[in-house]
Amino acid sequence: MRWRLAFWPSACSSCRMSSAVTTSISFPPSHFVPQIVRAVLEAVPLGLRLPLVYNTSSYDSVATLRELDGVVSIYLADLRYASNKWGRRFSKAPDYVERSRAAIKEMYRQVGNLVTDEEGVARKGLIVRHLILPNGIAGSRDSLNWLVREISPRVAVSLMSQYFPVHRARRSPLLARTISPEEYDEVSRLVDELGIENGWMQEMGASRDYLPDFSREAGPFPAREDVKR
């Protein structure tokens, strides 16, 4: 009974969002999966109808993801590195490549390719984010080639150019700068070369747009109309 009461507020909150002008519920939840599953099971009979978006680095166990089969509608997954050397050095994840790829395979098995409604709003499917990093650290060619070969050329891919070095990254010669136009162009050419059919690519220069300024009274990010490309 104590467990049920602990999750009741989450279920009620989800239902309130479902009745408001909201298109989905997104969360980075890996360490709260059992609680999330219970909250959703309680919320659905109360009227929850929104797609649930699982926002993840992809450093998840397949066993954990299987607990979410039929619960999560959209997986928003990172594919950060193609080399465990960089996963170990920069993310303290020595087995990032194997673990993230196994996780993405399981996510795709559950939800498949991205499905949108008549207004273009995502309702179900997998979206893979790939952040372009300086000096080839992200292993973009290997990562994207793996996606096309092992997942699907139709999987939705979000190629991001917004990397901006802060804090300790500024002290690393490999990470201390934003990506160059040449690095951006090299990855953009991979879209056609590898036959990636669906997705988006940020414009060059997005790193400044997505750098939060918490001293702004109107919020940490500029309004959409203020962003200059």
Regions found by a protein language model. Give the residues of each.
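Conserved Radical SAM active-site core
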Residues: 1-70, 74, 84-85
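Short glycine-enriched, charge-decorated loop/helix-capping segments at active-site entrances
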Residues: 2, 89-94, 171-178
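A cross-family glycoside hydrolase active-site/sugar-binding cleft signature
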Residues: 25-29, 51-57, 78, 127-131, ...
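Conserved radical SAM core fold
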Residues: 33, 58-61, 79-97, 126-128, ...
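Alpha-helix-loop-beta-strand connector modules within alpha/beta enzyme cores
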Residues: 39-51, 99-110, 181-190
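Non-cysteine beta-strand/loop elements that form the S-adenosyl-L-methionine
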Residues: 69-84, 154-163
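Anionic-ligand binding region
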Residues: 88-119
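Auxiliary Fe-S-binding modules of radical SAM enzymes
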Residues: 112-229
